Amino acid sequence: EKNAITLHDGDLSDSSGLIRLVGEIKPDEIYNLAAQSHVQVSFDAPEYSGDVDALGVLRVLEAVRVCGLTKTCKVYQASTSELYGKVEEVPQRETTPFHPYSPYAVAKQYGFWMVKEYRDAYGMFAVNGILFNHESERRGENFVTRKITLAAGRIAEGLQDHLELGNMDSLRDWGYAKDYVECMWLIMQQDKPEDFVIATGVQHTVRDFTEKAFAANGITIRWEGTGIDEKGYDAATGKMLVCVNPQWFRPTDVDNLWGDPTKAKTVLGWNPQSTTYEQLVEIMAKHDRERAKREKALKNV
């Protein structure tokens, strides 16, 4: 419907602005999805990441409290599987101990505990959704899954020579962002505020994601070598299409994230497999192949 959405400017580093906005709008629900959400960037800009990802959550909660909306406004905080970091349990669930392993994860842990504190101290309906990796065709291009699907499409169209990646053995639990948003909403419709893991319960390597993205573009990858010497070749032509570049390794890397969505399935009735992993890769690869075709057409104009 036209004009059904009103956009307001807001900044998680500006407490007075957030208080003004919350007081003006008096929302029934707040979904805080704002963050500096790139792990590698948090090593490059740790202070900024802490200001937005840690104190930003506090500013949202405090805005609700200061405006007198603790009993009428629900708050959802987008937390992260990166909290588990150097994992102490596989798969990870709501009771798994946290071991953050990056400035991003440390900042997010502060936000997680502030949500619980405001819930307990002020009786707020404030909840954390511990989101495992959620991807889509709208994913930022600096994230590995989108980097892969864009490269696969461009290579298939002759626009790019090869793809460089970091740790090919990293294990991730990848789901479709659209399905995860449904779970966020379900969490906020409960009578009792609780924290939930949002995950598929299935994990794959970066290597496997790469292989499937190229397959969706009609290219079969043949792997040779190990570690930093690993390379992926086009099985049909023998051309090297994928290689490892140590530049893309993180100073500290989380290598085994795997969520247990049992609580979300049981309590919320949520289906984490609405979109399968294979379908997710296909959606992203198809979208980015079409984009590569448009780029090629413009290049040839």
Protein language model regions, located:
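N-terminal Rossmann-like NAD(P)+-binding domain of SDR-like oxidoreductases, especially those catalyzing
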Residues: 1-134, 178, 184, 188, ...
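C-terminal substrate-binding subdomain of Rossmann-fold SDR/epimerase-dehydratase oxidoreductases
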Residues: 3, 10-11, 141-147, 151-301
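A short local structural element in Rossmann-fold oxidoreductases
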Residues: 19, 88, 139-140, 210
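A short beta-to-alpha transition loop/helix N-cap that caps and shapes the active-site region
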Residues: 84-86, 137-139, 205-207
